[in-house]
């Protein structure tokens, strides 16, 4: 416990909060080959690996994920939401922040219905979250 005198000399310092999706906090200038401080809500990338992984206890499933090389040269693991997908290696995808609680190391989501990623077929509810067009009347 510090004394009042110690606190007068050196006040308490508040902790800076760390970003939960750090890859979205940097851009990349390919002309200068330097990172830039462009914070972005989404980033484009190329899938380098598509596969499944198993969640932490007590859950059990095969969750779909893609390893993505972003436009700022970061490589991240992103979750593919929804039932079924058309992604393969070299697919161009758009990612957003947002972790998957039962998959360690997965801090990003792939946006369905954007770039090479198709929307979920036959989805009727929450269509906007899964990139599905309105059904024909």
Swiss-Prot record:
GO terms, biological process: translation
User: Do you know which PROSITE patterns this protein is assigned to?
Assistant: RIBOSOMAL_S12
Q: Name one GO cellular component term.
A: small ribosomal subunit
Q: Which Pfam families match?
A: Ribosom_S12_S23
Region annotation (Disordered) ranges = 1-23
Q: What this chain does, per the record?
A: With S4 and S5 plays an important role in translational accuracy.
- Protein's recorded name: Small ribosomal subunit protein uS12
UniProt keyword terms in alphabetical order? Methylation, Ribonucleoprotein, Ribosomal protein, RNA-binding, rRNA-binding, tRNA-binding
Family listed: Belongs to the universal ribosomal protein uS12 family.
Q: Which organism is it from?
A: Leuconostoc citreum (strain KM20)
The answer, when asked if Ribonucleoprotein is one of the entry's keywords, is: yes
């Amino acid at each position: 416990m510090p004394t009042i005198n110690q606190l007068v000399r050196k006040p308490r310092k508040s902790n800076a909060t760390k970003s939960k999706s750090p890859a979205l906090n940097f851009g990349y200038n390919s002309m200068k080959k330097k990172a830039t401080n462009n914070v972005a809500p989404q980033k484009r990338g190329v899938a380098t690996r598509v596969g499944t992984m198993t969640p932490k206890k007590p859950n059990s499933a095969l969750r779909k994920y893609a390893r993505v090389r972003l436009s700022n040269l970061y490589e991240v693991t992103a979750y593919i939401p929804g039932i079924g997908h058309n992604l393969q290696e070299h697919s161009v995808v758009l990612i957003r922040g947002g972790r998957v609680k039962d998959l360690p190391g997965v801090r990003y989501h792939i946006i369905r219905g954007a770039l090479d990623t198709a929307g979920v077929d036959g989805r009727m509810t929450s269509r906007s979250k899964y990139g599905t067009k309105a059904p024909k009347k």
